[in-house]
């Protein structure tokens, strides 16, 4: 697979941006994941995490999760929190967790809701799950609470992007650890461009206080939730200059929403698709693009969490 790398100067000329390098990943339109059944659960052990409450946003009593440590790891290792998409835990977390553990990084994939159980209250309803998970991770004697990362898909991608904001971090609670690096996958940038400037939205103005931390976004150029083929440009342009400098958007050319899905291709209707206008969404797995994204994410977390 070839990568077409654009210099900062080229990106600025074409898109009015001066703050990052964009990689377009040329992908083939492959319709099914690689042979063999996908592993649905992340490697490790099942754990039940005590819940927490975020006033005005919601509460959770307990959070089911899968926690895995690297084999033969040193006494303390970094860890990545994995947040699933609207369809629940579906194998994508396991796909990345295995590779992260092999690279020396522990993983914690939490279950925020079951398939079909997307909260009507929106993203704020699952922020308590993430806060509880981060608290639990820092309490583990084998995890270095100063070296935490967060990644997520779609619903979880939006969460992982928002958690890079100090405004959101303050709502999570002063005792909740601040992760050091974030890797959102297709976080539906077009919708967040509107939500973040809406005073009625619980995440209003979160973009104005994005932290200066490394952030790697993956999104397909044919994502049916988005408007246009470079949907995250406008969102990242809203962030403070220092945060923009630490952000990389990796566009997967020809990639759909969920291009790294570990289940067969599907179509469905979603009211939030097409930049909030609603309509049909295609999810077409591309194993080649998924493998490259996994390599990029593992390299990203290895660089910034230093296992």
What residues fall within each predicted segment?
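Primarily recognizes the serine-hydrolase "nucleophile elbow" in alpha/beta-hydrolase
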Residues: 131-210
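Bacterial N-terminal signal peptides
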Residues: 21-31
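C-terminal catalytic histidine-bearing segment of alpha/beta-hydrolase fold enzymes
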Residues: 244-307
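Short alpha-helix in the alpha/beta-hydrolase fold that links the catalytic acid
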Residues: 227-238
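N-terminal cap/lid segment of alpha/beta-hydrolase-fold proteins
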Residues: 39-73
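Short beta-strand/loop motif that positions the catalytic acidic residue
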Residues: 217-219
């Amino acid at each position: 697979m070839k990568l077409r790398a654009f210099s900062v100067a080229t990106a600025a000329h074409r898109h009015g941006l001066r703050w990052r390098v964009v990689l377009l990943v040329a992908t083939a339109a492959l319709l099914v994941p690689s042979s063999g059944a996908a592993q649905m659960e992340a490697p490790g052990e099942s754990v039940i995490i005590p819940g927490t409450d975020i006033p005005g946003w919601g509460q959770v009593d307990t959070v089911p999760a899968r926690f895995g440590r690297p084999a033969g790891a040193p006494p303390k290792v970094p860890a990545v929190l994995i947040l699933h998409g609207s369809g629940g835990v579906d194998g994508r977390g396991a796909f990345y967790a295995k590779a992260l553990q092999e690279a020396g990084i522990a993983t914690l994939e939490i279950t925020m809701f079951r398939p079909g159980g997307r909260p009507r209250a929106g993203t704020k309803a699952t922020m308590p799950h993430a806060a509880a998970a981060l608290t639990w991770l820092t309490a583990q004697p084998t995890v270095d609470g100063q070296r935490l990362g967060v990644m997520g898909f779609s619903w979880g991608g939006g969460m992982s992007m928002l958690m890079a904001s100090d405004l959101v971090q303050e709502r999570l609670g002063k005792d909740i650890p601040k992760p050091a690096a974030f890797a959102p996958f297709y976080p539906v940038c077009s919708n967040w461009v509107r939500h973040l400037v809406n005073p009625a939205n619980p995440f209003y103005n979160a973009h104005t206080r994005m932290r200066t931390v490394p952030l790697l976004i993956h999104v397909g150029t044919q994502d049916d939730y988005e408007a246009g083929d470079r949907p995250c440009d406008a969102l990242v342009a809203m962030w403070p200059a220092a945060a923009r400098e630490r952000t990389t958007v990796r566009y997967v050319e020809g990639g759909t929403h969920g291009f790294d899905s570990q289940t067969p291709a599907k179509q469905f209707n979603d009211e939030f698709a097409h930049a909030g206008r609603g309509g049909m969404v295609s999810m077409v797995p591309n194993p080649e693009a998924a493998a490259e994204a996994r390599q990029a994410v593992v390299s990203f977390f290895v660089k910034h969490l230093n296992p």
